[in-house]
Every structure is written in structure tokens, then in C-alpha cells.
Amino acid sequence: MENGKHPLVGVLAIQGDYAAHARALIDSGAEPVMIRTAEELVGLDGLIIPGGESTTMLRFLERDGFLGELKKFVETKPAFGTCAGCILLAKEVLHPAQPSLSVLDAAVERNAYGRQIDSTILSAETSLPGGPLEMVFIRAPRMTKVGDDVEVLADREGFPVLVRQGHLMAATFHPELSADRRVHQLFVDIVKRNLNGRRSSQPVEEAVYTELDVRTQ
């Protein structure tokens, strides 16, 4: 938190609508930083890995040791992956298989909901305060399995679409394309609590959701 006020949250600016993520972070009380090299990870308090094409993103990250440094970062600091970012965080990637950062205890099936023309916007219930959550799906992956310590915050047709595991969050949809800032706000709250030394092994959820509840009233 070099600016002394807002946490510094990186946005991996390789593919996807990273500018929309940056706007959502500003609205949620964080300072966004566009990241394209491993060196730029230094000093960040958290990181968002946006959507895009996961194999293309992976090839970019494999240059100059970026992938290794990114893995070290997400193992210890808050990270939020959306769509392709969710694939990169997952421990198991299916149809077809591919390497990943392997930190989120989940199995993810790529492009499970069909082609981009079949993408959709829907509203679904969530455990976050404030009522149903708008979800924008674009060539979305599907989480087919999550570990016991992964909290499902929202689902679609019985499959998780928004999850949290300690300092990690993942979504198979694009919250940055919605005016609803609750998802980004939750991540920023996790980043802030991590900075304050309240580790993810503690019961963070209740306090974070209470803060969200106050803001949605």
C-alpha cells in the first residue's frame, strides 16, 4: 500500500477487459496497476487475472520466468481470476488439459458453455449481501469440482460460478462487465484484511460480508 491509503491491486494486462477491472477496483477503493512483466509484481497487495484465451495467456506468461514469479505471488497474496483467470488458478484443467498455476482446489472444464455467440447474461442468487447477482458469461469455463475448503458464493445450474478459498477468489463469469461492484468489493476487502495481518485461515467471511452488507444498504 505504497500510496498510504488504497491497496495496490495489479491487473494482468495481457488479454481481456483489464480496463474494466481497473474501473471496478477504483470504485471498490483500490488503486489498480497494469501488470505485464514479473518485475511489476513487486510491491503489489493483490492481483486480478482477467479473462481472455487461457492458452495464449499461458504462452505469454512462460516467457522470462514470469509464470514462476506469478505462481509465487498467488501462493501467498490475494488473487482473483475471472474466466480464463479462473482456469489459470485451478489445480486441474480439463477438455483439453493444460498447465496452470495450480493453487485453487478446483477442476475447471474449458469453454464448457459453447461458442461466444451462445454467451449470456443472467441473474442468480448469491451468498453475498444485496440480492441476486448479474453475471455475464462469455465462452465460460465450468467448475466441475471444488475442494472441501472452497466456499461456493454463487452457482449456475448446480455448478459453482463464484468461489473463494482463503486469499483466492475465482469466477467463471465477467463481474467487471456489470455495474454491480460487490464481487470486486469482496476481493478488495480480502486484500485489505490480508494487509492488516488477518490471515485467510481466520473466519474472515463474516466480517467481510458484514462490511459489504453495510455498503449495500
Regions from the PLM with identified roles:
Residues M1-D64, E69-K72, R181-Q185, D189-Q217:
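N-terminal beta1-alpha1 cap of cysteine-dependent amidohydrolase-like domains
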Residues E2-K5, E39-V42, K72, F80, ...:
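Solvent-exposed alpha-helices and their adjacent loops that cap or buttress functional pockets
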Residues H6, G29, T76, Q98-S100, ...:
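A generic structural signal for alpha->beta connector loops
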Residues I14, A84, F173:
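Cofactor-binding loop segments of dinucleotide-utilizing enzymes, especially the Rossmann-like FAD-
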Residues P32-V33, A79, L168:
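Hydrophobic anchor at the start of a short beta-strand
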Residues I49, G81, A171:
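Redox-cofactor binding/interface segments in oxidoreductases and associated redox assembly factors
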Residues S54-E125:
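Cysteine-nucleophile active-site neighborhood
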Residues R110-Q217:
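Amide-donor transfer/coupling interface in amidating biosynthetic enzymes
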